Amino acid sequence: MMLKSCGLIFKGKRFVRLFIFIAVCLGFLIAVTILAGLTIFDRQHNHILHDYVARNDDIVVLSTTYYENSKSFPPNTAVILFNSVQVFHLKYSNLNVVAETMQGNVEVQFKIQPVINTIPFFCKWVPYLAVGQVPEDHVLLKLSTNKIDGMELSLRTPYETPRKVVACFSPLFLNERWQLLLATVEIYSHYGAFMHFYVRSIITDLFKLIKDNKNTRISPWSAIRIGESRAASPMFDPNTELEFRNQASAMTDCLLQYKEAAEFIVFPDPDDILVPVLGKNYYEEFTQAFKMFPTAGAVVYNMTQTSIESSMTPALYSPISMLASMKFKGEQKWGKLVVRPERVDSTWIHRSYAIKEGFEQKVMPVDVNAFYHLRIWKFPEVPTFNRSKISNPPFFDPYHLNATKRAIYKISDGLKIQRKFKNRVSQGTMKTIYSRLPKVSLYYPLIEVCYNRIFYSMKDIGTCRGPEYCNIPAFPGLRCTNVASEFVTYKSYRNIYIHQLISTDFEEGDNGCTL
């Protein structure tokens, strides 16, 4: 019929009708083609959704913190910290927890909250919280969807010793840069911070020096493992899809532990140095900061890029002389957080997605104060330490404009830091350990090249980044403190394989540091 109509038109002389008809025919064919394509796409899309919804998932439980009474949560609240795929919370809104009591079992729905609440995120695995209020007389808690068994949760309670300021540092790995870590510990300790370090691997002598400081606590930070019974493919390693050694999980874990004890918690990297400006110590600084921003749950201090000089020889090293050598590069980078812990339940590296209602995240102006990011290191052969350098600190110059006449630290503080450090490393066993610190860096140059490639160059901004993508050789004979851990797997929870960290500890070895 269509061909007959076309033939009649061709015999006629009304070319306008011919043109209109051809246009209608083409439009009809295009519409049919689009409809067919959409139908095929819709079927494929439905298959993808069906396959995702139907498949099982893995979660790795890192800790469960129980708060009998809390400034942040209702009484008898438990908080599970775990890792899973970044869309896990879109598929599951709750985890089912069975509380065993003397009167019988009680089921409690723990609400799932993503720590990094943005999709898509460049790492496939991210941290989560699951929060629920349990019976006061519970004997144990277990993750379960049946009445027979379950994965018993290893409960801990938060720290209770009051701390005005706690510094939760990002996890240390392959750590040998003693010039940095010793300075960080001395400076943060001087200004009143209690420091919590998470360690995956570190040279043993440096580990002992840090542990000796009364203002530090060190916890092992394990790479995560999923068992042979799993939803993921046998070759999949979730650590390659966790951002920077699972850093956001470590920071949130630290927040959960000090929620009831600390008035302020700051979350720096070890190469981020903050010197108080609004007060003589961190407590006064942060008190004033939150007075400036009364609605803040978190205040961001941006980082200003710097270069510094130091010595490879312990006898010539000075932490405050290193700071006095600082040169500002005029560049500002991503900020780091200070929080009021009762106002924030979790944190990412540069922001918190879990600030309680009524509060917000605010940014401290750089010209008021900022972290010194000790980014570029130089090790000249000429000794860097001299008293005149300590007594002549450079001016604070984040924009490289010579716009301020404010020294980066007070001379009296610098002299006290230097004196305390020298006293600590010149007595007893610490003197011997300090003298053994390495004069050659093995890991740092390799990590620096790797991180410049995968992170600072910004070439692969859309991919997950971490040390697992660095090629690090073994160094036999190098004494390191590494982490040993044990995980167990529970496979009877509906659609979820649960892998839980049940023990972790430090172990010394002489075959180098591991990831």
Curated annotation (Swiss-Prot):
Sequence intervals crossing the membrane: 18-38
Subcellular location field: Membrane
Domain GT92: 163-456
Main location: membrane
Gene Ontology CC terms, in alphabetical order: membrane
Molecular-function GO term, any one: glycosyltransferase activity
Keyword hit for Cell cycle: no
Listed EC numbers: 2.4.1.-
Domain of life the protein comes from: Eukaryota
Annotated keywords: Glycosyltransferase, Membrane, Transferase, Transmembrane, Transmembrane helix
One Pfam family linked to the record: Glyco_transf_92
Topological type in the membrane: Single-pass membrane protein
Family according to the record: Belongs to the glycosyltransferase 92 family.
This protein's name: Glycosyltransferase family 92 protein F59C6.8
